[in-house]
């Protein structure tokens, strides 16, 4: 494409000295860095981003109501944002997932991990021949048709289902959407395979895209700690950790969640894998309340898995989230037998690994127990973190030996 035929995009001009993050290829432009917009741009429309002297820096998507005013599509001036662009990004991402799928025997994985795969605001999970799409930013929504066209080119045999029913869309003035895009409707429960387990996924009604693929490696790691042990699985959802614990030879696993639907699927997952259902207990309750009740009754466990939902959405909630993480980990530590193992996680992007480790240390002090950190976890390898976007590392966890 020549200069004369290249699309002319509106220009987002940065204030003086506010281009440094873009020069380091960070994919976000915050509102405080913006001087003005030259030309008119609709919500999500493609814009060029320039410094205060007009020097071209990047090409991105405009979002006037968001604190993140622009998300970068490309740092290559010669690259237009069109179907061919999305096709290239998809094929580049698929190369890594092909290797992983072959190596680990996967039929399900995260195909696109947003900014880390060069597609900010785009999440795509693959479950067998179903592609589950989440468009979380104005730019991603604006490019919906181009992205779907690229998906159909790259995956002609796959059905596409939209799960853009995520509250974060409201922050950029978008409605929530859900439903089939192309191809057949997913079944009520779709079986997938993970590290020797068969698991049922509720694409249409489950959390996020239906299943937490990011915890795949952590679920496998659980098996080394659970042989002949009594296990408490908190925030169990559909029982991935419970099935893995049973496959690891645990004596008993108690799964706790507030959702009866999730617990019912967890029970089905145990049965699907032909595991001993008598070793699995399913409790519908609030985890905080139940842990306190267990403490009062003198209940003890050998392994506790603590995988709560995100406690913090923005910086103003961080202090409260820290208290929540400390309280729940303190309760777990108090319920463990000497030498017991705590597998604890945080999926809050604003919670750094260092801060999370400090919270666990503080929880141990409050519980009156010594704790050794023996293993560290992060999101599975199909959720990569590009070096210029450290915020992409959102999931962190620790295996702790409680003395």
From Swiss-Prot:
- The reply on keyword Transferase is yes
According to its UniProt record, the EC number is 2.1.1.191
Disulfide linkage:
none
**Which Pfam families would you find in this protein's record?**
Methyltrans_SAM, PUA_3
Entry superkingdom:
Bacteria
Family matches, as PANTHER family: RIBOSOMAL RNA LARGE SUBUNIT METHYLTRANSFERASE, S-ADENOSYLMETHIONINE-DEPENDENT METHYLTRANSFERASE DOMAIN-CONTAINING PROTEIN
Q: What is this protein called?
A: Ribosomal RNA large subunit methyltransferase I
| Species of provenance | Salmonella newport (strain SL254)
- Gene this chain is encoded by: rlmI
